[in-house]
């Protein structure tokens, strides 16, 4: 299975609008029992989340996993920092890339792969407002060109 495929449970839809995605990496997430049940129920939000590297370990921060309804006392803090499972050389590569100015790690999507929860992390650089407007303009122009070509080909 290729990266990013599987049963997609959550996506950060504005990520490609707000950031230039340079590279993506698949990582496992360390979750508690009730958290994985909430993730399987697609009760996860990636909107404000980001990843960081501390002491040679990757961590997922500000990702909200809603408490499992039947979990009562076993529920963990919905906003807790969760460890990401990556190989040492992947972590080192990402740490080296993050030293560049304006680079950050953002979660793009969460999905199940062979029964395990995985997160697709994107190495990204923030876009300026004029970049966002330019990409919208380019997308609309491409759409208009395709529409015209489609009508020409029908004749």
From Swiss-Prot:
TM ranges: none
Major localization class: cytoplasm
Protein name: SsrA-binding protein
Keywords, in A-Z order: Cytoplasm, RNA-binding
Record's keyword annotation contains RNA-binding: yes
Gene3D superfamilies listed in its UniProt record: 2.40.280.10
Molecular function per GO: RNA binding
GO biological process, one term: trans-translation
Native source species: Streptococcus equi subsp. equi (strain 4047)
Family affiliation: Belongs to the SmpB family.
Classification via CDD domains: SmpB
Subcellular localization(s) per the UniProt record: Cytoplasm
